[in-house]
Amino acid sequence: MRKQVLALSDTAAARIRQLLQHQQKPFLRLAVEAKGCNGLSYVLNYAQEKGKFDEVVEEKGVKILVDPKAVMHVIGTEMDFVDDKLRSEFVFVNPNATKCGCGESFTTT
């Protein structure tokens, strides 16, 4: 059985729902791009439609499209949302990732 590509915390799902309603978009798209000293960084964008090979993650009332090039790097990842005095951001807990010293990028094993 294949691992779930992406899991959402309740706070992440609530924030995504709020953002999608505000932007009047049906999807949030997750991709990875080459960046930082370790090679990869998470990228989130709004999407109006599903790409031909996108993986659809539907959980807790929201739909996230995972770019096909990102799937192998994010399998088993939990997406959370942190909002405190110092930051307000999505956080990715990826069991396959090794982070770099700068904290801006990761690599998968």
UniProtKB/Swiss-Prot annotation:
Its cofactor is Fe cation. Signal peptide: none annotated. Fe cation binds at residues 37, 100, 102. It holds the Pfam family Fe-S_biosyn. It comes from the Eukaryota. Binds 2 iron ions per dimer. The dimer may bind additional iron ions. It is found in: Mitochondrion. Gene3D superfamilies: HesB-like domain (2.60.300.12). GO terms for biological process: iron-sulfur cluster assembly. One of its GO terms (molecular function) is iron-sulfur cluster binding. One of its GO terms (cellular component) is mitochondrion. Keywords: Iron, Iron-sulfur, Metal-binding, Mitochondrion, Transit peptide. Residues 1-18 form a transit peptide. Homodimer; may form tetramers and higher multimers. Belongs to the HesB/IscA family. PANTHER family: IRON-SULFUR ASSEMBLY PROTEIN ISCA-LIKE 3, MITOCHONDRIAL, IRON-SULFUR CLUSTER ASSEMBLY PROTEIN. Involved in the assembly of mitochondrial iron-sulfur proteins. Probably involved in the binding of an intermediate of Fe/S cluster assembly. This is Iron-sulfur assembly protein IscA-like 3, mitochondrial.
